[in-house]
Design a protein with these regions (language model features):
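Catalytic cores of secreted/periplasmic or lumenal enzymes
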Residues: 117
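Alpha-helix C-terminal capping/helix-coil junction sites
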Residues: 55-56, 121
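Feature responds to low-complexity, polar/acidic, surface-exposed segments characteristic
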Residues: 2-50, 57-77, 85-113, 127-140, ...
Length: 158
């Protein structure tokens, strides 16, 4: 991860969907890809190659109607889903699953995100927030992503 400027990291700032794709793309050495998968990802945007490369590998998905919403803050359950898809792309184990029923808001995890969130908790990538909350629809911060990526890289040898 890089800072938002040369000398500012902004750990408490929210992370966007495009930023997640850019981080994962950078981990893979910034491979080329010029196939535009989404109507709202302009070829001139800084995230064009990262988003389209991640989409071509099944790491990220759109939000409907051919869009990606690159500048929207990523939710914690979306982030868990993207990281699990990235682990699968790497050939890593994605079968781990923690019992998340102990979190006060476990029932609010979307059905499509159940397995990714359980996997992220099992792998030590995601932990609760104050109040014993998993906060699946809460936005992920840059600090949370930094910790998740550190743990991910240790778990998957990146």
């Amino acid at each position: 991860m890089t800072g938002v400027t040369d000398n500012t990291f902004e750990p408490n700032s929210n992370l966007t969907r495009a930023q997640v794709a850019t981080i994962l793309y950078a981990l893979e050495g910034k491979p080329g890809n010029n196939t535009n998968a989404f109507a709202d990802v302009a070829p001139t945007s800084w995230y064009y190659d990262p988003v389209n490369w991640c989409a071509s590998k099944g790491i990220v998905a759109g939000t409907g109607n051919g869009t990606f919403e690159p500048n929207r803050d990523v939710t914690r359950e979306e982030l868990a889903t993207m990281l699990r898809s990235y682990a699968a792309y790497l050939g890593g184990d994605i079968t781990s699953a923690a019992d998340i029923s102990g979190f006060a808001d476990a029932a609010s995890v979307s059905a499509w995100a159940q397995q990714p969130v359980q996997w992220a908790v099992a792998k030590g990538l995601m932990s609760g927030r104050p109040g014993n909350m998993i906060a699946p629809q809460g936005t992920a911060t840059r600090a949370e992503m930094a910790v998740m990526m550190k743990n991910f890289c240790e778990a998957y040898g990146k």
